[in-house]
């Protein structure tokens, strides 16, 4: 406590206030604080919001919906940049007076008993009028006059206790013992940092086959043609694994073989050869000019190109000749290759960020700025948790000084301390453990956690990756692909699909492995998407439906507000999402069993969707268009042979109830 009144536990407050919390333009940001004082006099608080240009707005806070010890409000930023907010506490003499007068009248005290109270009230209303507009001031002076009049007691106080005057005082409070809090920061990014649908493909696999049926190496030109299908499915970010020259020394062969054949293309993550390094493109893909044309084509289709930022090098990367101090040099004079004992990665040299810090920092900044100059504003960062956190904090903040639109996604499958730590130092998005959350209880815990951590980290839920083919997809049949897509597309506003998912690719390299057989990481994998679609053997239409629903419904574009509802079947999960800005509301009910039909009674927590327990309403299934009557307890049946999920449009939440729905019990960000 630093002032006359106590202001504690202000949220959001990240890393002790040393890091900004996260938000995007148009998002409702809930703010809370514990405000208290001695005795029985009422206290209140003001939320002061300072925009990046210095414009200040002030809002009187209210008691939190489910925690009367906390004061609560919110704001919606409308511009990029660093915003600030401050909670000021103050004694609320008007509320104290109001409470005392009502209590005294209720026990039978008369005008004489209340003489001092009435005069004190009149003075308070005159004070409130000092900073009000002329029409409002006239109303407040009239209340003061009424309190001093000779009318019967209840008539004298009626104007002071009216709803209209109460609302006026909320906007024009009398503040005493004002105690200023500390400033806290919020980094506001563009909406794409929070809401986007990603599709991953290897440009080199877009070349099709030759007349003998052999794969042909793709180019940026063939990739541009492939983007039309991606855009038609409703994806808005297309992510390419590294597009740079691939090392030839210790090149990996098919299925991660240590011995490469003459025509093996190697792993794109083994970056660098005689043809160049991180600022070059693979010669077989085309030229830098061809890449620029690809970016332009993507933009015309409504797609952003995301590039892989893999900070490592092949043994024949130019750095290995010109900057050996970027690496760890062993006693025998050789450069240390990557190891994760007992695994060895002879085709990759990891960087040593402690050898020549200034040079390596400058070089990596140059590379990022180089690709920004080519039109890239989204980067998927490979294994950032294996590089120093202070490097990322420096790089991201430095890039954002001149390019605040740039988005960094952390590909970090790691423990919470690292995962959330990367969010704190600046990453806009992160991969998560969604892939391994398959049961109802696991998904409910996961969904609750990602919403609670929205001020720190934004989860991008990929249903598969070139590295990860989960056993549920290997053995769950085609319905499981739809189930996982429905979960990913609705649990988080960020989700992603790696190419081949829509073709139900499910064959692992071996039993108990999550690696794909004939992994695209090591060979060309052209696919005939058109034939599969024509044969009805493709998930493309369903993916397109999911993305269309997401674009149409703000409830699925926000992360903070999600509530899980009770069902009496462990195979049926139900959750609602509400956008507190627009009031848009969605209910999702999914059968988690890909092989059997299941039924359940869904027991809604009605206030979580802005309804009363007695309400009845009609919902529309946004997948099928069917309509159903709905109430607090409703029977559902889902057969994976027909529909794995209901995605239901609920009645729009009344405006007066929306802000309260954004309240969440503050989370401990220390983990």
Swiss-Prot record:
Q: Kindly state which keywords UniProt assigns to this record, in alphabetical order.
A: Carbohydrate metabolism, Glycosyltransferase, Transferase
Q: Where is the active site?
A: 382, 411
Q: What InterPro entries would the database entry show? A: GlgE, GLGE_C, GlgE_dom_N/S, Glyco_hydro_13_cat_dom, Glyco_hydro_b, Glycoside_hydrolase_SF, Ig-like_fold
MF term (GO), any: hydrolase activity, hydrolyzing O-glycosyl compounds
Q: Does the keyword Transferase apply?
A: yes
Q: Known EC number(s)? A: 2.4.99.16
Stored Pfam families: GLGE_C, GlgE_dom_N_S
Note the site residues: Transition state stabilizer.
Answer: 467
Give the first-level EC class, as a single word: transferase
GO BP terms: alpha-glucan biosynthetic process
Subunit structure as annotated in this protein's UniProt entry: Homodimer.
The family assignment reads: Belongs to the glycosyl hydrolase 13 family. GlgE subfamily.
HAMAP family membership: GlgE
Query: What protein does this entry describe?
Result: Alpha-1,4-glucan:maltose-1-phosphate maltosyltransferase
Species this chain originates from = Corynebacterium pseudotuberculosis (strain 1002)
Q: The organism's lineage?
A: Bacteria, Bacillati, Actinomycetota, Actinomycetes, Mycobacteriales
Which gene holds the coding sequence for this protein? glgE
């Amino acid at each position: 406590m630093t002032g006359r009144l106590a202001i504690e536990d202000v949220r959001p407050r990240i890393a002790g206030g040393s890091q900004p919390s996260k938000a995007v333009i148009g998002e409702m940001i809930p703010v809370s604080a514990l405000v208290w004082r001695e005795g029985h006099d009422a206290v209140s608080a003001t939320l002061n919001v300072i925009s990046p240009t210095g414009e200040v707005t002030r809002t009187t806070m209210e008691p939190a919906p489910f925690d009367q010890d906390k004061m609560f409000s919110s704001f919606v930023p409308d511009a990029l940049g660093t915003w600030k907010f401050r909670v000021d506490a103050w004694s609320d003499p008007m509320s104290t007076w109001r409470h005392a007068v009502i209590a005294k009248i209720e026990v039978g005290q008369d005008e004489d008993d209340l003489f001092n109270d009435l005069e004190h009230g009149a003075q308070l209303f005159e004070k409130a009028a000092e900073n009000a507009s002329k029409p409002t001031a006239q109303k407040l002076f009239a209340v003061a006059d009424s309190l001093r009049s000779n009318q019967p007691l209840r008539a004298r106080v009626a104007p002071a206790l009216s709803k209209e005057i109460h609302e006026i005082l909320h906007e024009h409070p009398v503040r005493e013992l004002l105690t200023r809090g500390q400033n806290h920061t919020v980094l506001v990014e563009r909406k794409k940092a929070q809401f986007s649908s990603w599709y991953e493909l290897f440009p080199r696999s877009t070349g099709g086959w030759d007349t003998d049926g052999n794969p042909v190496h793709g180019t940026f030109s063939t990739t541009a043609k492939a983007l039309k299908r991606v855009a038609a499915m409703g994806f808005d970010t297309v992510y390419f694994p590294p597009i740079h020259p691939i090392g030839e020394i210790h090149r990996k062969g098919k299925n991660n073989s240590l011995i490469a054949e003459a025509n093996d293309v190697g792993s794109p993550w083994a970056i660098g050869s005689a043809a160049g390094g991180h600022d070059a493109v693979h010669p077989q893909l085309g030229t830098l000019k061809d890449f620029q044309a690809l970016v332009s084509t993507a933009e015309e289709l409504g797609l952003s190109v995301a590039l892989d930022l893999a900070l490592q090098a092949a043994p024949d990367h130019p750095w290995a000749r010109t900057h050996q101090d970027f690496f760890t040099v062993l006693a025998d004079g050789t450069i240390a290759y990557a190891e994760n004992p007992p695994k060895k990665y002879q085709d990759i040299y990891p960087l040593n960020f402690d050898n020549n810090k200034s040079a390596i920092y400058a070089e990596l900044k140059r590379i990022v700025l180089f690709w920004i100059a080519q039109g890239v504003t989204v980067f998927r960062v490979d294994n950032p948790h294996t590089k120093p956190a202070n490097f990322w904090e420096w790089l991201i903040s430095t890039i954002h000084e001149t390019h605040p639109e740039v988005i960094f996604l952390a590909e970090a499958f790691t423990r919470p301390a690292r995962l959330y730590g990367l969010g704190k130092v600046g990453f806009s998005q992160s991969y998560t453990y969604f892939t391994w959350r398959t049961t109802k209880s696991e998904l409910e815990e996961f969904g609750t956690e990602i919403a609670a951590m929205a001020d720190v980290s934004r989860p991008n839920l990929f249903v598969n990756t070139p590295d990860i083919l989960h056993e549920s997809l290997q053995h769950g049949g085609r319905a499981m692909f739809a189930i996982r897509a429905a979960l990913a597309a609705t649990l988080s506003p960020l989700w992603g699909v790696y190419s081949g998912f829509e073709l139900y690719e499910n064959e692992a390299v071996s039993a108990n492995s999550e690696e794909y057989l004939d992994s695209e990481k090591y060979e060309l994998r052209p696919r005939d998407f058109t034939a599969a679609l024509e044969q009805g053997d493709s998930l493309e239409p369903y993916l397109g439906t999911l993305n269309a629903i997401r674009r149409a419904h703000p409830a699925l574009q926000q992360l903070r507000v999600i509530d899980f509802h009770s069902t009496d079947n462990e195979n049926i999960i139900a959750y609602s999402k509400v956008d507190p800005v627009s009031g848009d509301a969605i209910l999702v009910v999914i059968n988690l069993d890909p092989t059997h039909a299941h039924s359940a009674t869904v027991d809604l927590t009605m206030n979580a969707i802005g309804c009363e327990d007695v309400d009845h309403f009609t919902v529309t299934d946004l997948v099928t268009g069917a309509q159903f009557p709905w109430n607090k307890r409703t029977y559902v049946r889902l057969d994976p042979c027909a529909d794995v999920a209901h995605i239901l449009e609920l009645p729009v939440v009344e405006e007066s109830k929306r802000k309260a729905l954004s309240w969440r019990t503050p989370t401990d960000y220390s983990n």
